[in-house]
């Protein structure tokens, strides 16, 4: 007697649609925790019995320790030679982005406008992503060693340059003792964990590679906790009460404009420098990205007692979502184009 044939599994159309759009569970969870913070602000605020500060502090240190553990020094050495490309990417990340933020400063009014501008400048002072940049370059068939080098170096430079730019232009504190305290906190939570990870890299890099997906999930969960507690504090203190939905929409439109301007400028400079196709792709994808990992942890370090940290993170969250959607679409398009056509563009 014939056994009944089991029905074929129905494909998850929603998941497939999200994947084609460049979205994943983390991006949805990111906005989900903001919604949760809106409805339950006391759960993640300072008044909560849960020791969120201790949890996120340990999480930040572990994120940077695992980053050092995963850092491939051999791949970094392999990508060092193309200095013009590296200079363009790092100058875009830490010079061009902040300059654009400074140029639009006169358009922001006092009080709430100033705080919104500070959040945009903070975004512009951040380093590039590592994993997303490299994945996009791979899809677009770019120079992988150069992508790994630039994304990794950008993250390392960001440990120093992001706090430096923030202290110069955001006037974090005029009190030298508080600035010294910030330096010590950065040393303990960022520099030393990265250094420890690099020192143990040769012995435990294989372990980090085997558990790469789990470590990535740990990074993402840490970010979600930081974002949740930041927005809980902001909602509890009424930071967003003076902002309308139209303000958020304008901010989102501004992030789209920022991304398009940056990509256009990088592509134009790549043509002027006569980069080959593979290097143009690296310049565009590594130079236009901003790291949500670094942004979240740096915000928790640079604005530890501020109820406005949620607002500080808002442009970064919007830009992060846009860069994933727009960059994934662009990477897939470039990956399908003949090399000669992209090189001539």
Please place each PLM-identified region on the residue numbering.
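Helix-helix packing/entry segments at the starts of transmembrane helices
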Residues: 211-218, 275-291, 297-298
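Extracellular/periplasmic helix-loop-helix junctions in multi-pass membrane proteins
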Residues: 46-47, 238-245, 299-317
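Membrane-interface helix-loop-helix junctions at boundaries between adjacent transmembrane segments
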Residues: 105-161, 170-182
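The feature identifies polytopic integral membrane transport proteins across all domains of life
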Residues: 83-90, 111-125, 142-152, 249-252, ...
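Structural signature of multi-pass alpha-helical membrane transport proteins
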Residues: 2-111, 167, 171-277, 338, ...
């Amino acid at each position: 007697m014939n056994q009944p044939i089991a029905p074929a599994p129905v494909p998850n159309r929603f998941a497939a649609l999200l994947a084609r759009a460049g979205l994943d569970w983390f991006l949805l969870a990111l906005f989900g925790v903001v919604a949760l913070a809106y409805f339950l602000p006391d759960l993640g605020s300072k008044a909560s019995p849960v020791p969120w500060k201790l949890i996120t502090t340990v999480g930040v240190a572990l994120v940077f320790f695992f980053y050092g553990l995963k850092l491939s020094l051999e791949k970094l050495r392999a990508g060092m030679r193309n200095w013009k490309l590296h200079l363009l990417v790092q100058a875009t990340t830490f010079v061009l982005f902040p300059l654009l933020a400074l140029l639009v400063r006169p358009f922001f009014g006092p009080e709430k406008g100033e705080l919104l501008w500070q959040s945009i400048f903070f975004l512009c002072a951040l380093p590039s992503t590592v994993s997303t940049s490299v994945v996009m370059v791979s899809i677009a068939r770019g120079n992988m060693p150069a992508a790994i080098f630039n994304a990794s170096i950008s993250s390392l430079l960001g440990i120093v340059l992001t706090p430096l730019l923030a202290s110069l232009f955001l006037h974090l504190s005029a009190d030298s003792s508080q600035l010294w305290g910030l330096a010590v906190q950065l040393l303990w939570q960022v520099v030393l964990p990265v250094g420890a990870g690099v020192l143990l890299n040769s012995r435990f890099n294989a372990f980090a590679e085997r558990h790469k997906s789990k470590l990535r999930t740990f990074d993402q969960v840490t970010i979600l906790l930081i974002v949740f507690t930041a927005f809980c504090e902001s909602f509890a203190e009424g930071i967003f009460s003076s902002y309308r939905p139209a303000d958020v929409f304008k901010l989102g439109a501004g992030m789209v404009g920022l991304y398009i301007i940056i990509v256009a400028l990088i592509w134009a400079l790549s043509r002027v420098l006569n980069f080959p196709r593979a290097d143009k792709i690296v310049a565009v994808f590594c130079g236009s990205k901003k790291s949500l990992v670094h942004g979240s942890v740096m915000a928790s370090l640079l604005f530890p007692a501020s109820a406005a940290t949620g607002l500080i993170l808002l442009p970064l969250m919007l830009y992060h979502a846009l860069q994933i959607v727009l960059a994934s679409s662009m990477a897939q398009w470039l990956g399908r184009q003949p090399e000669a056509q992209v090189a001539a563009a």
